[in-house]
């Protein structure tokens, strides 16, 4: 680890935290018959509906191919409806999808929050949020170094 920079150590820690929290969230959401990715997709649809598949793909951490398969499954389960409006196909939640999200949402938000509430006070959480927001915004503009 001597060759690592503090930046590379932070990056590794973030990756490990993300993987661990996703595994635990997937296990937690099984009680609602959802995965973390499905939960995120349903939440984004509810927040921005109606929206196109392209708009949805920009908001979630699923690949374009993965989002197609997931939407097909969510549609078969009756959670979403895809509607063709002239040239555009939009996605919205059904009543069943809304109900599934409402069952899972309070408990999943509490579970997600517990990762931080258990070890950080409110001021530390605010600082972490501000720092992560700053890093995230920078990463959205980041370009690859020249070869």
UniProtKB/Swiss-Prot annotation:
Keywords: DNA-binding, Transcription, Transcription regulation
Keyword Transcription: yes
Keyword Repeat: no
Domain of life: Bacteria
Domain HTH marR-type: 1-137
Example GO molecular function: DNA-binding transcription factor activity
SUPFAM superfamilies, sorted: Winged helix' DNA-binding domain
Residue ranges the UniProt entry marks as DNA-binding: 53-76
Annotated Gene3D superfamilies: Winged helix-like DNA-binding domain superfamily/Winged helix DNA-binding domain (1.10.10.10)
Gene Ontology BP terms: regulation of DNA-templated transcription; response to stress
One Pfam family this sequence matches: MarR
Protein known as: Uncharacterized HTH-type transcriptional regulator BC_1936
